[in-house]
């Protein structure tokens, strides 16, 4: 059992602090911490010459939360794909004390955008974990595509559709098959992919449907 996993990100401090000033008590330590954090983040961007990348501080905080969600999702998928693990605890639903960036909810108990949504998605009863190895692919060397199914419910007959798309939407790889998605952890697909003619960024997408053509 893994007692604690989780990345971190700041809340969207522009809105949080504005609401706290209007509706909360600005004398509380929590408000002072968040106000100081926001001011220090602004100073840091200016001092490092990176302010032009984030003229809107909201976008800076939301991008942090996207990294937070992406990391949480990958860690949860890894743990749930490991047959030697019986469970895990996500740290944390709310941030507080000296761990202000750990929470999936902000000071007002509002979800922290993608940090919350990605963690929630990775905790669904049925998920597929998609891995390409290596993550950064040299065209001449190819890549290995591995898809693992994690099913905490009953077994179900399923239809899988796997596609790899370029940034422009061109489909460069496609495969489909039917199988019984068993309860537990199942290796669903593994194949070496020829990438000789590829260049740029590509995304792997997997659709899983039941016999009633409903997405799972």
Residue ranges: model-predicted function:
Residues 141-145, 188, 203:
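Short, solvent-exposed loop/turn segments enriched in Ser/Thr/Gly
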